[in-house]
A protein has these predicted regions:
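Glycine/threonine-rich beta-strand-loop-alpha-helix active-site module
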Residues: 105-149
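ATP/NTP phosphate-donor binding region
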Residues: 2-124
Length: 149
């Protein structure tokens, strides 16, 4: 029988999710969930400056996106985030190329992010987009500095 905690999991309730995964994986084959919070709510982007402040003392933020447009109404969500972050931080925006309209998680893309982190002297990386952008940012920050948020 499948664990109901996993079928109907609230992704914001990380403690319950961690315990359900631990119970379902006695051999510890799955990677642990290391994030401390997940925000799924209206106006979540407005929380970004405060979240960054909690995790980084620095003022240099590398914002990484792909070329896929996201909108809130008629406004570009990525541009809104960039503007919002620029009010409190020095922001460099790296746009990854969607080869053939699809971004792939390949070493080449991770290296681009790593190079941007080093060249800009980023204190924090914010990935905006889907799972591929997020995975690439995690891989790149891990390669540069395990403690970089």
């Amino acid at each position: 029988m499948k664990d109901q905690r996993l079928i109907y999991a609230d992704p914001c309730d990380l403690d319950t999710l961690r315990q359900a995964l631990k119970d379902a994986d006695p051999d510890n084959r799955l990677c642990p969930i290391l994030m401390d919070r997940i925000y799924i709510q209206k106006e979540a982007i407005e929380l970004l400056p405060e979240i960054i402040k909690e995790h980084s003392k620095g003022k240099k933020v590398l914002m990484v996106t792909d070329m896929t447009p996201y909108f809130r109404g008629k406004d570009s969500l990525k541009e809104q985030i960039y503007f919002l972050l620029n009010q409190e931080y020095e922001v460099s925006w790296l746009v990854l190329d969607n080869h053939d309209h699809v971004l792939h998680a390949v070493d080449e893309e991770s290296v681009k992010i790593q190079e941007a982190i080093k060249a800009f002297g980023a204190d924090c990386v914010v990935g905006i987009g889907g799972g591929t952008v997020t995975d690439l940012c995690k891989d790149a920050t891990h390669a540069v500095d395990d403690n970089m948020p």
